[in-house]
Design a protein with these regions (language model features):
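Active-site-flanking beta-strand signature of metal-NTP-handling nucleotidyl enzymes
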Residues: 8-14
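Eukaryotic N-terminal low-complexity, Ser/Thr- and Lys/Arg-rich leader segments
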Residues: 1-4, 120-123
Length: 123
């Protein structure tokens, strides 16, 4: 069931083939400060999936706040998150022309359009 005022987000990026093991390892123990910054920015139900044939990372999350741009700016300004991105951005290849890394004016991850949703209900 949807949380009122929830924005669903899906993003993609390419994972460098040589970075698969390191990327999975660092995400097995995400730094607490990074998670805290996401939580302060009203990000919930966040997951990243890997599709090996295309080396595609697919991130899904829900935003439950009221000012998405301001909350994303607060994440980008968080020192622990900036250190995290300094490590993880080098493992990825953006699909966005001109992108230089996370937290800049040009998005690093590509946001993709939702074309179907079924929420159903538990029986």
């Amino acid at each position: 069931m949807s949380i009122p005022h929830t924005k669903r987000i899906c993003q993609i990026i390419k994972l460098k083939a040589e970075a698969v093991d390191a990327y999975k390892a660092i995400h097995a123990a995400v730094w607490p400060g990074v998670l805290a910054a996401l939580e302060r920015a009203h990000i919930v139900d966040y997951s990243i999936n890997h599709y090996p044939p295309l080396q595609l990372l697919i991130a899904t999350m829900k935003y439950t706040g009221v000012d998405y741009e301001a909350d994303m700016k607060s994440v980008a300004e968080d020192p622990e998150t900036q250190k995290w991105w300094a490590v993880t951005d080098g493992m990825q290849e953006s699909f966005v022309e001109g992108a230089q890394g996370s937290g800049t004016d040009i998005p690093w991850w590509t946001e993709v359009e939702e074309v179907f949703r079924f929420e159903g209900k538990s029986l």
